[in-house]
């Protein structure tokens, strides 16, 4: 007999069975908590790749068609705000007006996680480099960037942002002062 707690006495057979049951329950809990790839990630990844191509085509209406009506988008400029859809459109219009031959070359695409739970949520992260030419100066640029895009159930972007040195990039390709 094994006395595990005051008042509870178990036979070796009962104790072994309880140990096995506890281990099986622990394994079940572990498996149920394991994160499985979000089934929407592959769809969202394809949408993300299309979106980057569309942005490079400088078709602003098509670029914005990938966004839901209610979005939050983070600007890459120093002190840049969290923007709604209208502000995001102006942000992209500024890039399209200032640059030409815009191209994004991804180094990788990664599944994103919910910041509150740490669980995969179908969002897409990417590291890569943007290149192009500043329209007003004719100077070329290339810079490393990080982007994140979160999607709703309809495949529309509801949250996203850019991380890169946007201010430095603009300063490096501005027209020379005379």
State what each model feature region is.
Residues 33-61, 65:
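Short, low-complexity N-terminal intrinsically disordered segments enriched in polar/charged residues
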Residues 51-54, 58, 66, 70, ...:
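Structured segments of extracytoplasmic/periplasmic soluble domains
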Residues 125-156:
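Exposed beta-sheet edge and beta->alpha loop/turn motif
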Residues 158-178:
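Low-complexity, intrinsically disordered terminal/linker segments enriched in charged
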Residues 51, 62-64, 71, 88, ...:
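Hydrophobic pocket/interface hotspot
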Residues 1-43:
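Bacterial Sec-dependent N-terminal signal peptides
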Residues 72-83, 98-99:
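A short gly/proline-enriched turn/hairpin at secondary-structure junctions
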């Amino acid at each position: 007999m094994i006395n595990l707690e005051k008042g509870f006495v178990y036979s070796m057979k009962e104790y072994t069975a309880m140990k096995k049951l506890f281990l099986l329950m622990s394994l079940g809990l572990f498996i149920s908590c394991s994160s499985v790839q979000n089934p929407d990630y592959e769809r969202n990844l394809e949408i993300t790749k299309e979106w980057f191509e569309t942005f490079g085509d400088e078709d602003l209406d098509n670029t914005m068609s990938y966004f839901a009506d209610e979005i939050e988008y983070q600007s890459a400029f120093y002190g840049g705000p969290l923007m709604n859809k209208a502000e995001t459109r102006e942000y992209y219009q500024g890039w399209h007006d200032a640059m030409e031959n815009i191209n994004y070359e991804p180094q990788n695409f990664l599944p994103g996680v919910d910041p509150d739970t740490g669980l995969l949520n179908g969002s897409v992260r990417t590291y890569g480099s943007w290149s192009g030419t500043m329209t007003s100066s004719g100077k070329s640029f290339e810079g490393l960037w990080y982007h994140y895009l979160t999607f709703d159930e309809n495949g529309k972007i509801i949250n996203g942002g850019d991380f890169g040195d946007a201010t430095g990039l603009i300063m490096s390709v501005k027209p020379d002062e005379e």
